[in-house]
Design a protein with these regions (language model features):
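Flavin-dependent oxidoreductase catalytic cores
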Residues: 1-259
Length: 259
């Protein structure tokens, strides 16, 4: 099965083009130079690609931290149409399944922590999840043959009771949202840690800060309310999910013994 994650739809974000196009061209030039035996030019092009990527990431991060405006309804509609267009092209290209990245924009709109809108996309739980459901419906209409996986970001708690992550839903709302996702046609859900705090320690906390595979209990609760598969890791601990990641080198051995 060919699987594609829709992360950056085809709308213009300054800096993304530089990362993809200019840096990509530099990498191609480096490979060509190396194939021709010109190590000096290969090194030069490699360093150029690294610099272009680093500079673009730095600008994007700075702009996201300091110059973020509330998206207009027109902009949200444009993004939704672009995501649907990406899905349609993926289907035509032979892709079998896509994952909708439910963090970032969708997670921010779903989040009661980050979403301060006063229109139809803000306020109540129903309003905050409205856009994400619209995106899924648009994908289903544009690419009816695709299997849709949805990455569901859950805001969890630190040891001191503070929130870990912002761009997602708290546990109770996340479970309720999972049922809505199934109703609009999502075929599979991946339960993940919410982020969007600018701190990677939220998404990948230091060892010892949280129990190993701390999202598994939430994934289990999600699975209890939906009939579709819920993707998670280390499924041998619970036996409730038909899909899991290979989180240990002995996982294949466990599968063979279990079968």
């Amino acid at each position: 099965m060919l699987h594609l994650q829709i992360f950056h739809p085809e709308y213009d974000v300054p800096g993304v083009g530089k990362m993809i196009m200019e840096a990509g061209i530099a990498r191609q030039n480096a490979a060509q130079a190396k194939a021709e035996g010109n190590e000096e030019e290969a090194l030069k092009q490699t360093e150029l690609a690294q610099k272009l990527t680093k500079d673009a990431y730095a600008k994007l991060h700075h702009d996201m931290q300091h110059f973020v405006n509330e998206a207009t309804v027109e902009q949200l509609n444009q993004i939704k149409e672009s995501i649907a267009s990406c899905a349609h092209k993926a289907m035509l290209a032979g892709i079998d399944a896509i994952e909708v990245h439910g963090d970032r924009l969708l997670g921010s709109l779903c989040s009661e922590v980050l979403n301060h809108r006063s229109d139809v996309y803000g306020g109540s739980f129903e309003n905050r999840i409205r856009y994400a459901l619209e995106v899924v419906k648009a994908i289903k209409e544009a690419a009816p043959d695709l299997t849709i996986e949805y990455k569901l970001p859950i805001i969890t708690l630190n040891k001191d009771g503070s929130l870990r992550g912002k761009g997602g839903l708290k546990e109770a709302e996340g479970i309720a949202f999972a049922k809505k996702l199934e109703e609009v046609g999502v075929d599979m859900i991946q339960v993940a840690q919410a982020n969007h705090t600018g701190n990677m320690g939220d998404t990948i906390p230091p060892m010892g800060d949280v129990p190993y595979n701390w999202t598994l209990p939430v994934a289990r609760k999600v699975k209890e309310v939906v009939s579709i598969p819920v993707a998670t890791g280390n499924v041998q601990l619970y036996g409730t999910s038909p899909i899991g990641g290979i989180v240990s080198p002995i996982f294949p051995v466990w599968l063979v013994k279990k079968s």
